[in-house]
Amino acid sequence: MTLRLSRRAYAEMFGPTTGDRVRLADTELLIEIERDYTIYGEEVKFGGGKVIRDGMGQSQRVAADVPDTIITNAVILDHWGIVKADIAIKHGRIAAIGKAGNPDIQPGVTIAIGAATEVIAGEGLIVTAGGIDTHIHFISPQQIDEALASGVTTMLGGGTGPATGTNATTCTPGPWHMERMLQAADGWPINLGFLGKGNVSVPQPLVEQIAAGAIGLKLHEDWGTTPAAIDNCLSVADDTDTQVAIHTDTLNEGGFVESTVAAFKGRTIHTYHTEGAGGGHAPDILKVCGESNVLPSSTNPTRPYTINTLDEHLDMLMVCHHLDPSIAEDLAFAESRIRRETIAAEDILHDLGALSMLSSDSQAMGRVGEVIIRTWQTAHKMKVQRGALPEDNARNDNFRAKRYVAKYTINPAITHGIAHEVGSIEPGKWADLVLWEPAFFGIKPSMILKGGMIAMAQMGDPNASIPTPQPVHYREMFATRGGALARTSLTFVSQMAADAGIAERYGLAKWIVPVRNCRNVTKADMIHNAWRPSISVDPETYDVIADGQLLTCEPATVLPMAQRYFLF
């Protein structure tokens, strides 16, 4: 016996299917399901009178033959597609994406459910890969709580706490600090990796930081990003297969942007603040977006350009870079970095895929819990101001959604040599997954999984008779407790450090994972974000021209994903 359901009734029961569209939060962005891996009439769902019961949707197979957890009927939004599927998790990793059920009685089953299988209901939810923030100033450990609650599951950067150096630069300097920070990483339910200080003109001080566990090196103008330091740092990175991140010379003291590009010598580098106000060669750091060896990112304070952006930045910059507003030279330095024209161009360069990544710059001119929000606010603003992308159509914004989700998931992972473990929803990868109700997409996740275990979720009063009574807020779950913490999160280190046995020497509890393939990455590897325009910036008007076109847009006066979500 069959029963024909309306699309609405089907979506309410099993979630949207092929051809259905979903609005992302209160934005103008619509995604459309491209494929449904489930089979109509054979869907699995847990609950009283539902399918996943013994002899029905649940098989008799033993634990070795079934996943530890399945997420049923979820909409997956990732760089590779927008699909409806069941997701299987086994031993902390994504085991399969397909059709779950009982293969003994159901057709087309690719994921067998057994008595050893836990179920997370994904009906009506969107699942994304955990976010990766590659621009972290480790100023306070409480940032990790904020980041995790926002959907970020990997944090890369540097620092030692609220030291003056860390307040301004993302460096964990020297072997002693590196060891202490790696030991501290054991206490937090998030994947972590640390950058050493790259500003020195001879190799050994850099090599010893890589050997101590750094995943890469950070060049920052506040430590002196000279051509000699750049050249030396990249040479060490080439020898150790680690990445270099750079914040270039705002004052153009050691040379102009052309001097910095020349010092790269065609070698791969992640350019932080390839943007309109974050820092770097004034006013034309945006030029580096056209270089094949440059992997460009920007940070979230200027995302997107609004009527309040300029006013906010001056005081923020004075504090972060230890400047004195009573000193004329310090004030001039700050004002040189805040340019409405280049901030506006940054919006468009993100939309066209010239800027490949987006990160926070946490507590140092950036908000650690707003990477995902501001990414999608930028996408919305560009949809409203510029219309559909050529790759999209009147029905959906699928390509734009894939482009923007890649900016904080797969592209940072590729850049820093961790894409073999995290950054996308693909079999074999660590099960760092974020579940969203569509109305709250990008703003407030329903649940965050780390290594296949629930790490944080919206949870009601623990003394209530059911999980939902107020006050409902984010609470840490069992993946953050006891020995489970060290088995559901990763610490990234260099291959040199892993080979040297730092895990045993430092007494680390978390699994350590070496970064790899950092030096052969090019802009062409930045998924959906590989455009290399020829850019010029007028030194007087700051107008930005890319491939002959003036890049300009109006500041937003109102944004989605904002106050209506934060009334309480």
UniProtKB/Swiss-Prot annotation:
Domain of life: Bacteria
UniProt entry tagged with the keyword Hydrolase: yes
Recorded metabolic or biological pathway in which this protein acts: Nitrogen metabolism; urea degradation; CO(2) and NH(3) from urea (urease route): step 1/1
UniProt xrefs under Pfam families: Amidohydro_1, Urease_alpha
Cofactor needs: Ni cation
Residues binding Ni(2+) 2, per UniProt: 218, 247, 273
Gene3D superfamilies, per the entry: Metal-dependent hydrolases, Urease, subunit C, domain 1
Keywords of this entry: Cytoplasm, Hydrolase, Metal-binding, Nickel
Residues annotated to bind Ni(2+) 1: 135, 137, 218, 361
Amino-acid positions noted as binding substrate in the UniProt annotation, renumbered to this chain: 220
Name by which UniProt lists this protein: Urease subunit alpha
GO cellular component: cytoplasm
UniProt cofactor note: Binds 2 nickel ions per subunit.
Listed GO biological process terms: urea catabolic process
Localization per record: Cytoplasm
EC number: 3.5.1.5
The species this protein was found in: Burkholderia vietnamiensis (strain G4 / LMG 22486)
